[in-house]
């Protein structure tokens, strides 16, 4: 299998993969090859090797969340989305590296070591699904799955020069996935092209009665949707707030991309979108994170095993919850219920905002990837403020909306830049169509890191 050769060549220097299921993958490939010779093809993913972020449960294969606490954790069952992929004939090749418990944005805080950016080894890949994006960029796998609670699929995809999709909340089941911020979490595909993302995504979507947030909708052929015309799409540009403080190199690439998609579609216009924190009370984030880690934090032997950057995030959560609700259990509960109610109200009404435009287009990130040294100096809760501002990506998690990032250029130093296209709920087909039209009008997605050619 060619991907195993790529892993042997690339993973020692990139550190994108934690576990390589070599024997299991080869056994799967033998079965699938026999089916293909007999004329049976399960789906477009038949025999295709993919990697899974190591927060997604795989039966009999360790799922560690990038943490020493879960180093020996071996699930008995596959996550719902993994079962769907296996039925579709995908070969589960490897488990990818991630920020510990998906809680930081650089991928420098993994128990298994930092993921390096394949375009510049002294730079971060972005996180928390950095291993998935780096593995795809270096051709260790056809595609990969990540999870996204604030940008964790799109952020590393942008900085690694690949395509990443954050779906509408509820289209892909979260059953069997270790949570980061459960109310914001989604599982999404990463691949080399929009077409590949569409094919992978089509096999991931499906109702799961075991996931309270799962949505039962008619199946859609996303690969076909990605080929639909885009000439009438109206593109909104939320410049105020979401284009502030752009790195000049990022601004150059994004503005040129907007010029291209404006010609492909029905034009662009500036629109106003409120700041993301008008929709989200940070108390929700703190409460969701702390609720998963509470018992481990109460056991000192476990608490001491967290990575320093993760520990800072958890300490911030504890302090914020105490300060924001006066320290009483009743106060915390009331604050959480009120904050979630406001969030759900915003989510129910947000589709009405898409009346004067069909999609939003904006920078995925506002600057270039920091160095690993910088990331290790500023770990934890300060990352989002100092190194990796995530307001642009977080907007779509908070509102439960889909968004896709596509490569739109390179800085003068050679680092990839991403353009993000987002829309109302269940508009994945529309977003993929515009992203595909843009991709076919440019050549950015064809570029690969030097050693991956």
Regions from the language model: what does each represent?
Residues 1-149, 259, 352:
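Gly/Ser-rich catalytic/binding loops embedded in alpha/beta enzyme cores
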Residues 3, 25, 197, 235, ...:
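Residue-level signal for inorganic ion chemistry
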Residues 9, 13, 87, 137-244, ...:
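Structural helix-boundary/capping segments
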Residues 30, 221, 246-272, 293-304, ...:
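Acyltransferase
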Residues 45-65, 224-238, 287-351, 363-365, ...:
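Short helix-loop capping/hinge segments that flank enzyme active sites or metal/cofactor-binding pockets
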Residues 62, 395-397:
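Conserved short alpha-helical elements in the N-terminal third of ANL/AMP-binding
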Residues 68, 72, 213-214, 281, ...:
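Short, surface-exposed loop/helix-turn segments at secondary-structure junctions
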Residues 69-74, 185-192, 314-328, 421-422:
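Short, well-ordered beta-strand elements within core beta-sheets of diverse protein domains
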